[in-house]
Amino acid sequence: KMPVILFVDTFNRYYEPENVRSAINVLKKAGYYPFIPTLSNSSKILCCGRTYLSNGLIDNAKKEMLDILDAFRPYIKQGISVVGLEPSCILSFRDEIPNLIKTEETEYLKNNSYTFEELLIKKSKKIKFRSINKKVLLHGHCHQKAFDAVKPIENLLNKIEGLEVENIQTSCCGMAGSFGYGKDTYDISMKMANERLFPTIKENSNDVVVIADGTSCRCQIKDGLNREAVHLAKF
């Protein structure tokens, strides 16, 4: 099996570890051997620094990024790719990290880091899809949209016989990290969610599955509508 670094972000690690377990199982069935690197001289949990970046704490974010490089270095030298579940985290490997730290290693990460579905689509011929007579609503995370990374999810879902896929034509869900939790920004967050995302979900019955790879998107849907949205890996 082809080895691949699985970058486990803070949100999925602590709040939805079932997504990580599901991703590992799916990746194995697709012919990959996912593994989770750690720092050799520390028990510190790796973080991409996204939460620091979102608050302008660049130096703090760079420290987290340097830890990732230390942990990944032996595997980067072997030409092993990286896959992640949280779009805003894994896509920082293609954007913020190589822009803030300019080395051959970060350039490698820029060109060899993939979202879960981007990696799976490469091996889709090896995956045995079960037929499912269901409808799913797909909400793309803002980072996925910015990197044109929603299409791979659609392509994978369309390989499942009997599955009806509707890609909700939305902008941001309104949560935007912690934006939707702010006292001064809550109303704006709700207005954004009620533009298209919430109405589309409410138009569909509860047996329609909502797929959203972004943790903040799933939280917005859960808090705003009391509907469970799932990561593609769990679906």
Residue spans of the language-model regions?
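Iron-sulfur cluster-binding electron-transfer modules in prokaryotic oxidoreductases
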Residues: 1-235
